Amino acid sequence: MKETKVQNTIAGAKGITFSGDTFVVPETHDMVKTLFDPMVRKSYCEMIILLILAANGLVFWLINNNTLRIETFIGLYIFWRLSYNFGIGYLLNVQSNHHRLVKWARKAQVFKKNGSLVSRLAEKEIKSQMGPEYDVQKYPIEFNTWLLFRKVVDLILMSDFTTFICLVVVCAINKDYQFINSDQQEVWLISTRLILGTVLILFNLWVKVNAHNTIKDYAWYWGDFFFRQINNEDLIFDGVFEMVPHPMYSVGYVGYYGFAIISKSYTILTVAIFGHFLQMIFLHYIENPHIDKIYGPSGNEADIEMLLKLKDLRHFDNIKPLVGLLNFTWLRASDMTNLIMVGTYSFTIPYLASLVDTVRVGETGVNPGTILFILTIVIKVFESLSINILLILQSYYKTFTKWYLSNDISVEKTLNNWSIMYNSLISLTYSSFFGLNFYHVLIGLESDKLFINSWVYLRIFLGILLVFTQVWINSSIIDSIGYFGWFYGDFFIPKTSQQKAHLTKAGVYRYLNNPEQIFGVCGIMGVTLIIPSLENLICCVLWVTNNFIRINFIEKAHMIKIYGEREVMKDSGVTKTFKKHLIPGAIQRRLSKGSEDNSDLLNQHRRKSTIMAGATDSLDNFIKELKNTNTRLTKQNILELSQNLYFENSDYKLVIKNLNTTENNLSTAFIGEPIEVEWKAPENHSPKDWIGLYKTVQTTYSRYKTLISSSDRWTQVTSDSGSYVFEGEKLFWEEGIYEFRYHLDGKHDVAYISEPFELTSANIEVPPSTEGSIVLANELKAKVFDRAIVGFGSIDSPIDSAVQKSGSIIQTYNRLAYVISKSTGIHINAKVFLYADNEDELTVHKLSLKLINIRKVLDDLSHAHYPLSEEKKEE
């Protein structure tokens, strides 16, 4: 029962065995329909299964003593649960690793027409399942073995569930129908239990139904242990599988806890925990290894993933950094310091405090518990303010990095030192909180100081569950984004081409965008639930508030600056699933209306409303796709696709001058070309109005408010109408789709958005011989160097001398390398300029000779005789 990509197990689906035999998979039915639908024929095994299930009712009727009933059904449930997790687990394990079930069937000649009792029984059973027209000999032995294995699964799984339900019933009616006895519990509590339990059961039912609709019988019965379905190479994450990892084993068991709540029985709760625990063992040792073997990465991919994890450690002196006390190393000074600190605040101080009744503060005696509480609050407030302020200063002003560089410490060292500081402060807060509660345990909990005194075992169970959830979530986060992400590496290390250009959507981030927002502090909630005192409640509120502020107002803002709105605000799996099931389909399908001439194209590419913008392609990608089509769009269509018609009747206007128009009616300009924008505003407009230049792919999510910085690509609106030329540092120096935005009153509220336009590279053809070097040099100078460097000299002027006069040497070299690579189709690195044999003597003319030589070498290697510029166009 796994998240397997499968079309269906109906006629027409193609199957292939592990030995290479292909076949058409016939129709099969799910467990419930097979057993309980009177319209579906019953096999001999299925009739036996129904009799065994009915026998549970006979056990209930024959045993009059309810205590004996409970003990009997506990024994039966344990038997069937062990049969499931260890019996079926063993069969699947030997089948996965050795194809043992198929070998047994082949050795016993189960499906041979030899007249033996075994073969006749097997044939009758399969034909009673599949119909008399089913020919056992025409199908692979693997598929027939799977059909018989399904009956074993049906027997064990249905018996497991039936005995559990019988146990729920006998526990619920115990002690004079305790689950609804108003003499034992108040009516409002009974009603709350029944409603909550029913909700959990219905949710569990939805999970099971949705899971089966997604994975079908093939994966429900572990079909890929026996054969594969063709075009079924990847796991699928859809429906409930997009909400939580392994839903059949995680939230697929919440119904068990719902039954425990309804029955008001700790016996049922204990049995549910026992069954769920065994199921997780089954997942870890049987299910996951097979998933990794069948759907996991290849050997090379696994090696690459391991190398990436090792490279993640280069910022931490190539040793896993300390997270809490995880990765502790005796020979690392910071680890020893953390160990002493954690031990002191968690155990030593609370123990010493428990030895005294009061602590003298001046003339007043103060309870040690009060001092520990104040200490915990002070430490948490200090950690919250210091970490948050440092992250803000680092995000906007690079304060942390600048200090290290000013002291001749490399950038790579900043993240390692930050990780030590961050982990020490976090460990200090948790140690002080633990110490506060440890002190109260040592002196004995006073019931009058607790909000809740009842349901002790339930509180302990839920509290421990929340603590383990936080530990699991934190480990999943580190596994997904590495230590670099855990310690806010994006704040400290500049993003390079080697780093990921997109935020990860693997692991726990497939289901939640910010899993740490709630689950990152649920351990504190768990401790508060176990010891529900006012002190713990205040601490819990403080933890949750700080976590919310740090993630939503500091981390998210920085991620938007680095990766853009579109990347940060993608819907998580849970959000997608809730939208799919809660938002009416008519709203989801509503698209902008387009012209009749382009209706097919617009229906395919048009953006949805702003609410659903997260599920659409960017205008940037759309225009790139448009280049490969023969469809012509009008400027009106382009404006409509970009959602700029929102401002059609605005009193504010922006018009971009001197743009080129392609045959697809797209407005373009060459990288580095000055761009003049004219504005028109009402007479009473604010003198603080301003115009900024943005990349559309980073502003897709908000057409009325700009959420990212203009990075100094802006100008003040000084009059009711006028124009301004964006050039040099005011421009973007990379290809893409861009737009100008008119903002109001010095803020980021948008009054008008210009038509989108594309920045492209000029087409410069590199000649095949040095005879054309002068022409190439002049073209490079005119289309690249004159635009990138103000006042550039001749083609024989040293490039380095001109670059030295620019604002940023490295940035200028990177721009030159990028534009030349895009324009010529020959990739060069900034190292061409930085590591030249004699930087002072490198000229545009000599650079053109280098390009011609590179082109010649590439042509010789590829035996190609077409111009590189033509190849570039095709790309």
Curated annotation (Swiss-Prot):
It comes from the Eukaryota. It is an enzyme of class 2 (transferase). It holds the Pfam family SKICH. It is found in: Endoplasmic reticulum membrane. The chain crosses the membrane at residues 43-63, 72-92, 153-173, 187-207, 243-263, 266-286, 339-359, 371-391, 425-445, 460-480, 518-538. One of its GO terms (molecular function) is phosphatidylethanolamine N-methyltransferase activity. One of its GO terms (biological process) is methylation. Residues 64-71, 174-186, 264-265, 360-370, 446-459, 539-875 are cytoplasmic. It is a multi-pass membrane protein. Its main location: endoplasmic reticulum. It catalyses: a 1,2-diacyl-sn-glycero-3-phosphoethanolamine + S-adenosyl-L-methionine = a 1,2-diacyl-sn-glycero-3-phospho-N-methylethanolamine + S-adenosyl-L-homocysteine + H(+). One of its GO terms (cellular component) is endoplasmic reticulum membrane. PANTHER family: PHOSPHATIDYLETHANOLAMINE N-METHYLTRANSFERASE. Belongs to the class VI-like SAM-binding methyltransferase superfamily. CHO2 family. This is Phosphatidylethanolamine N-methyltransferase. The lineage of its organism: Eukaryota, Fungi, Dikarya, Ascomycota, Saccharomycotina.
